Amino acid sequence: MNGYFAYDAGWLEQRHALHTAREIWQQPDLWAALHQQLQLQQALWQPFLDPLLANPRLQIVLCGAGSSAFAGRALAPWLREKTGRDVVAYGTTDIVANPHQYLDLTRPTLLVSFARSGNSPESMATVELADQLLPESYHLMLVCNPDSQLAQYAHQRDNVCSLVMPQGSNDQSFAMTSSFSCMMLSAALLLGPQSLAEAQRPLTAMVVRCNELRETLQPQVKALAASGFRRYITLGGSCFTGLAEEASLKMLELTAGQIVTRYDSPLGLRHGPKFMVDNQTLVLLMFSSGDYARQYDRDLWNELQRDGLAMQMVGLAGSTQPLCDMILNLHHAEDDVWLLFPYLLFTQMLAFESSLALDLTPDNPCPTGEVNRVVKGVTIYRYPSSVA
């Protein structure tokens, strides 16, 4: 491979964009590798997870900081619906300051930690707080850095299962791309309603489609990025709300805050945030695969079209959505979880191209150091067990 997204590798390196381009591009290959890896590691995670998931009193807490938190927020509604289990998603940044408001001390808890570096202060503190406060705590750690503090925490502990994502997922660029999608996919495969064997067919179809999209979408995405929008609103319901939050952050990060972003649900936008839509705004709406939920998506789309205030509108949909020029049918899937990944790929490509269009450096959009790849400056305070 001499480059990515029609860019020469040397040009990308000169623009400090090579890592980001490669890490977005490689994702379909990593997803296939992840499925195979989980099959090979089944003897490690299955004896740990199966007894826990069979307990009807178990609460599953998906947690992380920043993008890692959004992976959980994208999956939690889908997991609740498809498995009937009690699944919630909280930021470690919330849990650390007020653990008693988020951790249920009356129930066995499986804490699922998403972490790229595995060294974020809040991630380690949340795990330690869970073990300190919960009478029955278990940990599934989905990490990208095998040498991280979080991965090392699993050693010699029976209540911890640590799984390292495929090689290459520990992004070297500032923004989380491969790491985010691999951790999200691993949780969907391990905690979802299908076995790995049952998930292979829809996963393979999604991987094949995303391999096509990374080739075919680039001209359209590049034109959007060059259009000059200065505001960006991402919209999606249920699991797509979490994905919209991630897409919003990715644009904010890679454009170093030069493009103002916001996320919401299709129904939530009308309750005030719609004021943000003006003639400098790109609105991105992620359509659900479900007929019922998609009615609400379609109503807002039509309303925004009638308003005529947005600079541009783009819809991302499965092939059941009627086509128009501004709605892109990215993948045919009967389940929202398999739309998460092609939608994510589009939003990552758009943020990357927008960074280049603004003459920024995607691999490190903040070279002056005020915002860092691994968070700095956080002091963790000891939490006394007597505090409630």
Predicted regions and their residues:
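Short, charged, surface-exposed secondary-structure boundary motifs
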Residues: 98-100, 171-176, 270-271, 337-344
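Active-site phosphate/pyrophosphate-binding segments
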Residues: 22-29, 34-50, 155-284, 359-388
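Hydrophobic alpha-helical scaffolding
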Residues: 10, 14, 65, 113-116, ...
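Glycine-rich phosphate-binding loops that contact phosphosugars or nucleotide phosphates
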Residues: 53-203, 286-331, 350
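Short, positively charged patches
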Residues: 15-18, 25-27, 45-46, 59, ...
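Phosphate-moiety recognition in structured ligand-binding domains
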Residues: 1-23, 28-34, 155-159, 198, ...
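Conserved phosphate/anionic-ligand binding catalytic regions in large, soluble enzymes, centered on
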Residues: 17-20, 67-78, 234, 238, ...
